[in-house]
Design a protein with these regions (language model features):
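Non-heme Fe(II)/2-oxoglutarate
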Residues: 1-79, 178-185
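Catalytic core of non-heme Fe(II) oxygenases with the double-stranded beta-helix
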Residues: 65-184
Length: 185
């Protein structure tokens, strides 16, 4: 089950874009160097990371639809990621456990992508999720989030022009099993 939620207003989007424009990004494989499928850039500045993560997580938690759907116990810090032409993230499932600093871990039941660019500003770059024999594609308006089970096979299609800027995070839900969560929602 997927949930699309409008979580960011124009001023929040503008602030996140400004953070991204003024902070350094590095090869996304810095957090997973053995992942050959990952070809993107991620924010690499502690102060900008903290500010953008707080803004994104506060926006998510402010929405009753998100809280009712995800039933979060814990949410990983949100990370800004950028895709420029030629970049993609091949088919994968997200890690079952996310290590949190300085200690601990989070069971990743749900993944969340928050779109920060309008879809017309870049070509390609859709988030595609495998659902049995079907594929669902998401390229949402800026300010919208898509929440989906972390164990579903998904990918970011290659960006062919423009720039795809998103925030990503992972959620540990009160209800681990996606089928049980769907029945409750």
């Amino acid at each position: 089950m997927f949930k699309e939620i409008h979580v960011l207003g124009r001023s929040q989007i503008d602030e996140l874009r400004q953070i991204a424009a003024s902070a350094p990004f590095v090869d996304g494989r810095i957090t997973n160097p053995h992942n050959k499928a990952k070809q993107n850039l991620q924010l690499h500045d502690a102060q900008a990371y903290q500010k953008s993560s707080n803004l994104l997580l506060q926006a998510l938690m402010a929405h009753e639809d998100f809280r009712n759907f995800a039933m979060p116990v814990n949410i990983a810090p949100a990370l800004l990621t950028r895709y420029t032409p030629g970049m993609r993230y091949g088919a994968h499932t997200d890690n079952a456990f996310i290590m949190l600093q300085p200690q601990g871990s989070l069971r990743s039941d749900l993944s969340c992508t928050i779109f920060l660019n309008d879809p017309a500003s870049y070509e390609g770059g859709a988030l595609t999720i495998q659902l049995g024999t079907s594929r669902m594609s998401f390229k949402l308006d800026a300010g919208y989030a898509i929440v989906y089970p972390s164990d579903m096979l998904h990918e970011v299609e290659p960006v062919t022009s423009g720039e795809r800027l998103v925030g990503i995070t992972f959620i540990q839900s009160r209800i681990k099993d996606s089928f049980q969560r769907e029945m409750l929602y």
